[in-house]
Amino acid sequence: DAFGGIGPILLPMAIAGAGIIISIIGTFLVKISSNDAKEAEVQKALNVGNWTSIILVGLASFGLVNWMLPETMQMEFYGEGLQDISALRVFYATLVGLVVGAAISSFTEYYTGLGKTPILNIVQQSSTGAATNIIAGLATGMISTFSSVLLFAIAIWSSYAFAGFYGVAMAASAMMATTAMQLAIDAFGPIADNAGGIAEMSDQNPIVRERTDILDSVGNTTAATGKGFAIASAALTALALFAAYVTFTEIDGINIFKAPVLAMLFVGGMVPVVFSALAMSSVGKAAMEMVEEVRRQFKEIPGIMEGIAKPEYDKCVDISTKASLRQMLLPGLLTIGFPILIVVVGVLIYPENHKLVAEMLGGYMAGVTVSGVLWAIFQNNAGGAWDNAKKSFEA
């Protein structure tokens, strides 16, 4: 190639660099003509910037692939040996990543966007009480995994078919090329949320709060979309990471027909569930501490509600800061400790068979990956759907 044989190494970085520049261009295309724009108009403006960035990255990728790669190169396919791959097939793998990223944005918007069928269903179910609200929200989060996981499966399979493990890596690189745009869209949510809080606390004109509510409802969707991209990139790179793991440990593969490996697969599947439970429990404990502190201040400091006394803000900040650090200690230790424990126990039980221990750890990682992706999609979309269902009532 034109780079002394390192073109395939430089290509992902070149696409990422082009993606940053293109994302900056995309932000200038996010424009709203009316000061009284509704949710659909705001979402459309953000989509214009996002979709333009994705299309331009696709065009840039085509040029970079043809410039930086040789006409043909050899790629290894697991169990099939080396095969000749054309530069065009690498571009097809890159295109897979972009298309899947765009599709994930669309599906996430559908499941979490204000006025969409899933949100309207949650609103309707809420008319009969909290129980049916919870059922509808859980069902929305669960059904949203269907489209996302199918997209991940298609992306992994097709990108591998086009260019082997390199194709999978290129698909992930292309998907993350618009990270700058995705982060901007993701950050839009909390910025709009905090702006609404400031508007309410500073007694701004009611129309200001109405407009920030519109931005906030769109922000709930964009935040879910940004997290969806992060989940997708993790899922898409799983095959490449397992290939690197197999190469590094010098094992033939991860055979789940072996009892210890299958056992660790189930253990890995359990960890994201327990992690989620611990994280939710931590939030509950921190919230209880905060509520008790606020109640104490209302009781002991007269005049807070009338605005003539100053609350002790530092106490609330101290509670949230300490709780966020202290309560996440156990979930963090769980994720770090289990892999170490598996290796230690494996070496003690099979001191002469280190390859089996490596397979056990690989089985654990496979379980974590599959379970973690499903739980991440479910919680991300269910949370966004509930949040915008709440906005529907407030509106």
Question: Which residues fall in each region the model found?
Answer:
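Hydrophobic packing and interface segments
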Residues: 1-395
